[in-house]
Amino acid sequence: MYHLIALLIGFFVDLLLGDPHSIPHPVVWIGKLISAAEKLVRRLFPKTVRGENIAGGVLWVIVVLVSTAVPALLLYAAYRFHPAAGLVLESIMCWQILATRSLRDESMKVYAALKKGVPEEYRCAVSMIVGRDTAELDDLAVTRAAVETVAENASDGVIAPMLFLALGGAPLGFFYKAANTMDSMLGYIEMPYKNIGLVPAKMDDVLNYIPARLSALLMLAAGALLGMDAKNGWRIWRRDRRNHASPNSAQTESVCAGLLGVRLAGDAYYHGELHKKPYIGDALREIEYEDIPRAGRLLYATAALSLVLFGAVRFLLVM
């Protein structure tokens, strides 16, 4: 029951405070661990395709074991000392694992810059949350990129970690966070990460397979509650949920596009190179600045529904 209470507290603290930059974040430590482990395995394994594939697998095991074991041991000691101490520590961990408020806040920085109408400012703001080249994007392309980011990251930044937290408390939440961070840092198709990042990328796909689809359905339900076009959301999800190189990324993005009645995705430049991508959704209307706060409201509603569902599952597991 303590895990469930910690999740509830962590969720609401996240909504209240987000991720203050003045507080050290565990993902930064996980990132440093990944960098150190990468250097180690690159020295230990041969620089061949097979050698780097194996190195990536060993790296993945090292990082998830350490990232899971450390919080588990800390929580064990805290709960042994006093249940209240354990609850406080686990609540803080749950808060830091979730990213609901920060995802919305970062998108709203883009919205505020767009409202000011200064291209340099809104391009800079969106560059903080997307990986594509932003120097030549116009205002509507920036708006589209911000909406896509909220929609896509609703799953791996909020709903998926919440599911892992509900099932196994903070240690399992950190297990997921470590795996997801490895994919973000190493899961590229270009060298020097193409081979060593293969296992981290594939494991992230596996771990997100069910959460991404749950997130899509929960987002669809949230959109219906908000009065959005749930019928079109369902239609676009059924049609476009595979319109991405990743098996999971288009799940929530397609739902969001359908609910809003806009077209997302399409070709984009990365490091000066054009990447051809299929569109997601139909342009029933032109995308507009207000779609960014709409996506934020959809994110919050989806997160709230997820908390209710996953909290109920956790409650039944401990009954």
Language-model segments: which ranges?
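Hydrophobic alpha-helical transmembrane segments
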Residues: 1-179, 187-319
